[in-house]
Amino acid sequence: MSLASRMTSVGGADNYGESDYGWDETVLGDMHLNSAINLDLFKEFLHIDPPVYKVKENHRLTEELRELQSLARKGSKIEIGFQRLFARMFPRDGNLIPMDSTMTRMIMKIIRDSGTKYKLGIPLLGISEEMIKKGAMVPSNLVYSFNCFLNIIYGRSEWIRSEGIAIRFKMYEHGRFIRRDLTISEKEYNFIVGKEVVEIRASRRKERFIADYNSLLLLLDVAGQRICAHLCSQLGEISGVPGSLSRYHLETLCTAGDRMIERCGNKAYEVLGMYEALCVGRLLENNPDGITDHTQFSANCEEELQELIAGSVEPAFMKSQVDLIKTTLEKMKNQDISNAFCLYRVWGHPTVDIYEGMKKVHTIGTKVKVIPPNLGTIMVCQFRKMFMSTFFKKHHRYPPITGTPGEYLERCLKDNVAIRIEHLAYNLRDFEFIRIGETYSVPDTFDMCHVLNDKAVSPDMSELLESIKNGKGTSCGAKRRGMLRWMEGDSLNCKSFLSDIDEKGLSEEDLLIGMYEKEREIKVAARMYSLMTERMRYYFVLTEGLIADYILPHFPEITMKDSLNVLLKKMWESGGQRSIGSMDVNINIDFSKWNTNMREGPTSDTFREMDGIFGFKRLIARTHEIFNASLVYSASGKYLPTIEDGRILDDPPMCYRGHLGGFEGLRQKGWTVATVCLLAYLSEQNKIQMKLMGQGDNQIIRLRMPTSYWDSLRLTEEMKKKEARILSDKFVHEMDIIFTGVGLPIKVRETWKSTRLFMYGKVMLLDGRQLPQWYKKTLRSYALSNEGTLTISGVIGTIATNMCAAGGGSEVPCVMYLFFLLLAEWSLEFMFRYHPFTRVGIKDGSSMEFRLNEKGGYVHKQTRKTNNLWLKSLLVLVPTAVGGSVTIPLTGFIMRGFPDKASEGYAWLKFLGSSKSPIQGFLKNFYTFLPNDTVEADMLVQSPFSLNHKRPPTPGLQTKENIREWLLSTPRFQQNRFIRSMQVLLSGFDKKSVCRELLTERMNPLISHEVYETFGHVYCEGIVARVENTRTIRTLHLSREDRKPIVAKLMTDEMAYIAYMWWRGNTKGEVFEECATKQARKGRNVGWKREIMGITTPHPLEVLFQSVCRPGDQCQRSDDYITSKLVDDGKFPPFLGSKIKNKVYSLQDEEARREPLIKTGARLARQFNWIGMGENMRGLVLKNVGSICDVSVFDKFVDDDPSDNLYTGSLMHRFTPSSVSEGCFINYAPQVGHKVFMSSDTLPSLSRGQTNYTFHFQAMYCFLQYSISKSGNEGSYHHHIMCQDCVVPVEDEFDDIPNETPSIVKAQEEQYVSIIRTTLGYIHTKPRSAMVLEDKSPIGRYIEDVEGHEKELYSGVVELLCWKSALEILGRTRDTHATVGTEDLQGWPRIYAYKVSRRHIIGKVTSFILYILAVQIGELPLPYSMERVSRRAIDVVSRVGLEGFSAVASLCLGRDIPMVNDVVTIVDGFAYPETVSVCLRSIKASILMTIGKVIRVDGFMSRRSVYPTESMTSDDFLRILGFKAVIFYGCTKIHEKCQLKGLDQVTYAEMMCHHRCLEKLLSSNLLTHMTMDRAMKYLPIKITKILPKISSTRPNTIAVTREVETENREFSDTFPIDERVTYPEMDLKTNQMIQYPTSSIYKWSDILLGIEHYDHVVVMGDGTGGTSMVAAHMFPNSTIYPMALLESKNLIPQDMESLAPPMSRKLTNVDSSLLIDLPDDIRKPTFRTRMLERVSLMRGNILIISDIEGTGTLFRDIVSTCLYMPTSTDVLMKTHLADLCGSYYMMKGAGRIRLRGSRLANLRYGEVFVSFRVTGGNIRPNRRGLGNCIQEVMIGLMNTQIETATGMLSQIESMFPLAADMSMNIAMMKMASWGGSFSRKVLGEDGLKLMGYVYQYINTHYHFASSSYRPGDNRTVTPRRKEDLTKLLCSIMLGVYGEDTETIEEVSKYTLIGSKKGVPGKSYFKVLMWKTGTKRALEHDEYMVGRAIRNYRTRILEAKKLDGPIGLPFHSGSLRKIATWGYKIPISASGGWIDNHLQI
């Protein structure tokens, strides 16, 4: 019966009845190449190079070949394989023909028009129709060849399926074959196609090419790939896509390879296999780094290439083509080479040689290797160390250890402190005689899904013998299907199975390993993969699963289990922006046959250690024992083993025993751990830090060079490069030695090094930028490129998915969407012409029928006549979530993971429908909602985000039900206990009814879904579904004769789907709202007939683009918005996306969370209160879990949280069930984000409020970052959040389900529960796991309600945060939050910083540091001993790296105002802008200086506090109370106990004293069950801005002002004015207290005191904020706008205040908007116009102040910019007389010009101030008048009294006390950076005492090296340290002695020297200050620090400066005196002792 008779039309309705049993359409055969090509059987039959092994005959193939030979002409030449036809059929063709791009151009116009309306600003909008037309051109021969091959393949399919002649494809029968004659590339070919064999005859040449059907598919595949490459290359090149190859380069590469194959045949692939290496070599050569040898890799490749070429048939020709490839690569840019690297499959694949592949495995795998036993010891010791260290870091304790540890390790275990490899006592041998005990136990309910897979397996021994005896060879048919074997056997108890293997091993019956050739490899010698027997496969799968789940998390270097986003983050951290200019060396290791070379010797101890961790004796350790005992054989089906005496004989290499190595993929994770251990060992031995990323044999090492150490040695750049070269070469050499020693040889020739190129897998990063590699996915993006049922939706989905993945490696993913459209249009064109699955075409203008569910039945629908262009457009545009196909909208190409696809779909349709187009009506119809008549509850529960559309029946649903019915009832599988049980179990589980009973009127489908998942029935049903969806089961079912039609039904469903799409586009539903978000929200409610909560999420396309203010736009909106700043040369850390973090705290047992079968129920149980789950639903969850587990065995399974304080966050944002994406992430190259700074600080109502809103911040950032980065206009963007329907408060409340509903009650009947327990197992005892920690809840007095205790709660929160931050600073571990970007301050959530005081944080952190260190040194943190404690603290904290302060820094981003002369010192403003490193340095300096000031710590602590217990342990609480007992009660007992046992070990009982100090504190320090996040909700946002100080008595200005004569004429003199004038002699800068960060405060205060009021003041060049601070105080009623050049673009992500100048950012009348809105550089072309736009919007009087530093042309730029402003704008600019006199004529249009001078300015540089008003016209300064004015101003300044000027300094300092305080703080910070941390008290001492203290400080902290010294030793005086300490001493001497000429002359001659033996006496004096004969130019900072110290001492403390000579130690002057203090030694008057003991 034909298909046509079963369809009423092209999309006909389903008319199958009972009589149709047994009839069906034939299954569509493969049209996708999915296996390796091996033609050994052809060679054997045709006697052409026949294989050397015994071949099993294939009778069907033989018959076809025999008939083919009979049809052939005599004398014709035969060749096996089609590869040599590439050059003939795909020659270089100058003729290009257009591909149909009508659909693409139409859609692009829609996107272009809509995107312009939306102000989307992406590159896609700039691609015109003409560009697409021009780009959519392909070589004509490729298109013609592809169509020919396609027709032949279609014809063969039609011939086989209809068992007749494929007439429509012009083919005719020819015996067992069909035939077609074609002309391809002007050559005639005869195609003779059979079911197995294909022959292509070149008519004129009398050549015959014979191969299998796969070889024909290869021809199609190569043609298809090349069409994809050409289309995307040409369009990409025209549209400027990075990585787009020119047509010339693409064709040159393809043609060179084709020619090589044509001349040398299959052997050419050996040379082409080097193509990727040539690309990498070219990249390395293009990018030398001066450290590594950038030519070495290419040279090594050249050697190998020459060997391969020499062995080829035509060496000279091969060399010429290889040279052509190399020459082509040389001409290409880096990004083009990277993309061309992905073309390695464009030449197809060779015919593989099975024998050679087996020979390689046998040769390497049986080679006996002598491996030194010590290497195995090293490996296992390193494994133990790494496992224990990471375990301790996570759990704060060690796993169980047995044996005898070494001395240092024993101490670490005893004291429970972290192992530090830098500790002097550390020794790896400490781990040699210990064993890690059982840490994890195998779950009783081990997940069955681990072993269920439809992959092939090897038959067992008896089955293989039987198959060979029966003449079936090694194929064994159904015995090879793993799924079928499992079903026909019995189900497996995983734990029992593993225990049995542990005891007995595998039986001989199971010891077989079949080898088969891997597909799609460019290797002639086949790459062999392994087929294990069923039980062997279970063994490896289960043990590898254990390693993956429990071992790998302790090795973060291994990336095997990392998700895509984690992998991206790791790659970006290793090779991203921070690697630019780095000397760190990337080493790309290439192991030689990594798996096969693995041997038992070095790994056995490590594997036994893994066994011990799981409580086994010899499980994983049996790996090599199994390999060695197994029969290894070729399982391709072509080899026939020999049997003798019932035993298979060895026939190496095709069949052998005694394999000593490993096999690919069989112990991958275990061997990866072993490899990582050896690499880590090498790193430690070489004392070099290493960043490692690895999986299997792909190991990438980044050696971190000790550059800071080299800096300390003052090495030059060249010397550093030399050291880096030596270190990296040494590392590679030692790596080669050690891996060769363990039998894993490294291909040193193919291992390459580079500091610039980073490559992991196939992903490349060069100089911190990800290189494009989109060809890899592009080549697989056409209709026949992937396996599976060939459907329209599947084709579109495949192409969309591939091109979306291509976008992830591109800087322009939106253009990848254009490629998707074009490639989809091409595929749809030939699919519409003839659909190979349905066997019919889709005719334009035809009508179609299909049926819909309506009113409980089916209704037939007739469509209008089709327009195929519009139908194709709908198929590619409309996503499935809104009723379309499996496509991906443009938005999905830009970011991944947006959860609500319906909301995204409606936003996309609204976007497309916003512009006029031929399909606008269709798109608007799809935007409407057509509800389904029925509510399918199971669809809602199982697909929580879905909409209930009116759609045709789900394709294949009835077929699946039929398969399941047969599967569960057929006797064939009844011996399988699981299958047998399922028939009964699922009969009692009515899925639809159960789901219906889970629905409520107001519901959250995600919760219902999770509750549904807790049913044991659902887990079992999932296994059944997994089984029934396998290819094996589908094939078995299709082979039944007693079934209903399946294929024909699917064919009808396919056509019905197409018909529905056209009908739906013509049918209008209901528009609920114009807002897409609300349309989705209401669509859900209407469709499901209930209120759906917690699902609908606004998409950025809908929310962010309704009101966009771009650079230059006038923004007058006051509503919330996201601020973004685009800087073309930006270096901002990119936002990569973030993972959703659940914020529910739970004490639930760890074992309950890890049990796979109850983990869903366990998650719900610990979140009951947060979810707000009703009692009935809770009961159902617990009852469902109870069917698998007795929850009473756990100490805590359900969290009781009556106060609701154990969680924060809404369900919508934080609930992460399995059905939801783990987060939102970018889908483009990360460097795109460098140009964009984004912040939600201008979105306070959503980002800092107490209410949760339906706003997806991660999605907004991901989308905005891309949109803005590509907009092209520098400046700021405001994306206003306008729609009140989109972003609404989250509603999490939902209804409870009814109690005791019938279907649920039935499902939980005892008979079904019993089956679940029998099938899956039952947990009746608590699983053993050493991971579980004891309950650490603090002991104390708890309160439930914190109302009325807000102040105490604030104290407790701050104390707890500070305690944890202090521990982190001092090297303790703490679980930190995952960072959002690549460099951020997210140690604590950003919101915390807005609610706590920076002063409190720094004060309390300092207190805790002092306490902890006081305990360590045996002192009390009380005033009488504080000096010693402080010194120790300064020592320790000084040595902590910046990363140690990340947690405390994240708490200080609120930046409240510091207090003057406060004990808590806050260092602010020493650099602009505030980068992460600047912030960390300032926090570190603040803590150091606060330590130096602290005398009493009790002032920082509160006697009464309330602590949130769920964020602290009992240890935390106890230590904090212990500290309070000491400082408030002076309790010495507690302190003594802490000293005796250590802070970590002391207990409650031991801290009790007879004064009852602890009891008192326990009564006043309360606890509350609350998380830190919840506690923060109770704290208000701090007000951090202050009003500017308005002084009642403002001083009078001492500035001198003169008006400049002007003239009005068009042309002016351009002769310079002679500016030679006499300046006042005295420079008052030396008397200024404010030196840092700027002293401009003085001069601007003086100048502005004489200026009248303005409404708006713009201050240019004000990075420090000093000038704007002065202006804010001088004009308190004005708005001040600071502007500055961003000297660094590496800002703190999302932190607006890091852009604001630090000195003025907290003043209420300072507005930083111009900093955001305008380009940061006045010289940028757009600056002037943008400035004019903003200034024009200001109302009132306007003053522009310029404090920009610079001379020459910059003066002209400033003047011309200011004169460009609106008339009547006043300007006041700082300049220099030289610039003014040389360029005065530029001031055309300036009136009311005044010249101002101040005695407080830098007069020695001629610094003056010019003010003028912008008038326009020809007014300008008169040359002579300006010259006279200059003379008058200078005379006036000379007449200003010095006393008047110095008095003015004091008055200004009193106006700005914070600035004076800040200056001293920064000066002290500068001293700390030079190596000396001194308190103000010390700096205020008598001059001699201060010098003596500093001298003693240096001698107690530093020493000259006696011999060698190591990196990280901060006490050794290296050359750099010597320079810094010399600066320190010189600046202090300037501060003590003054800054007169004689002092400077003397100070500049001093340096540090070292005494070899020291001065004998009571103490050793080894570092001396010595005067040399050589003067050193003192640096500017030395003067500034000296002045700060001197003015602090003389003007604040009124100390006197020292007089007299400085002298020499022990010899003369001041140094003679201070050298004797504390050193009772004889002093020689001549100083002879010193002369004999000095070391320079």
From Swiss-Prot:
Occurrences of domain RdRp catalytic (ranges): 583-768
EC number assigned by the record: 2.7.7.48, 3.6.1.-, 2.7.7.88, 2.1.1.375
Alphabetical UniProt keywords: ATP-binding, Host cytoplasm, Hydrolase, Methyltransferase, mRNA capping, mRNA processing, Multifunctional enzyme, Nucleotide-binding, Nucleotidyltransferase, RNA-directed RNA polymerase, S-adenosyl-L-methionine, Transferase, Viral RNA replication, Virion
Keyword Nucleotidyltransferase: yes
Reactions catalysed according to its record: RNA(n) + a ribonucleoside 5'-triphosphate = RNA(n+1) + diphosphate; a 5'-end (5'-triphosphoguanosine)-adenylyl-adenylyl-cytidylyl-adenosine in mRNA + 2 S-adenosyl-L-methionine = a 5'-end (N(7)-methyl 5'-triphosphoguanosine)-(2'-O-methyladenylyl)-adenylyl-cytidylyl-adenosine in mRNA + 2 S-adenosyl-L-homocysteine + H(+); a 5'-end (5'-triphosphoguanosine)-adenylyl-adenylyl-cytidylyl-adenosine in mRNA + S-adenosyl-L-methionine = a 5'-end (5'-triphosphoguanosine)-(2'-O-methyladenylyl)-adenylyl-cytidylyl-adenosine in mRNA + S-adenosyl-L-homocysteine + H(+); GTP + H2O = GDP + phosphate + H(+)
Localization of this protein: Virion; Host cytoplasm
Signal peptide: none
InterPro entries, per the entry: L_poly_C, Mononeg_mRNAcap, Mononeg_RNA_pol_cat, Mononega_L_MeTrfase
GO cellular component: host cell cytoplasm; virion component
Name under which the protein is recorded: RNA-directed RNA polymerase L
Annotated source species: Lettuce big-vein associated virus (isolate Japan/Kagawa) (LBVaV)
